[in-house]
Regions:
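Conserved "HGTGT" condensation-loop signature of ketosynthase/thiolase-family condensing enzymes
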Residues: 1-151
Length: 151
């Protein structure tokens, strides 16, 4: 978790809250960023929020950001507000169990900075050993969870 308390609804443009949340989750799980295969993005489809999250992912994961898959399931189910994090956690667990990462629907014209695998339009088969689920909430309360399957 992290709290940047930058603004009621907007993230800090430097993405430090998102970065710290993801970094802390990886540390608690005792894994390196390179272990993550899939990220269920907070991904609300807001230009600022999505760019900030994408920048934080690139900063934390470095080159590995271009090897993992990342999608926003809000594109399929909408923003469930208080329930969003739990439903997105379930999507992450299902990706591990089923070996299928969910798509980012309606991603017809991504910005130029969206140069990683955002799983556009269609689900994708992929072995997922570790998944990271991001939930970046109102007032700068950020949570990221790491999931893995049985050994």
């Amino acid at each position: 978790m992290s709290g940047d308390a930058f603004h009621l609804t907007a993230p800090a443009e430097n993405g430090h809250g998102a970065f710290r949340s993801m970094r802390n989750a990886l540390r608690r799980a005792r894994i390196e960023p390179e272990a993550i295969d899939y990220i269920n993005a907070h991904g609300t489809s807001t230009p600022l929020g999505d760019e900030v999250e994408l920048g934080a992912v690139k900063r934390l994961f470095g080159r590995h950001a271009y090897e993992l898959s990342m999608s926003s399931t809000k594109s399929a189910i909408g923003h469930l507000l208080g329930a969003a994090g739990s439903v997105e956690a379930i999507f992450s667990i299902l990706a591990i169990r089923d070996g299928i990462v969910p798509p980012t629907l309606n991603l017809d014209h991504p910005s130029l900075s969206c140069d990683i695998d955002l799983v556009p339009l269609r689900a994708k088969q992929r072995k997922v050993r570790y998944a990271l689920s991001n939930s970046f909430g109102f007032g700068g309360t950020n949570a990221s969870l790491v999931f893995t399957g049985p050994p």
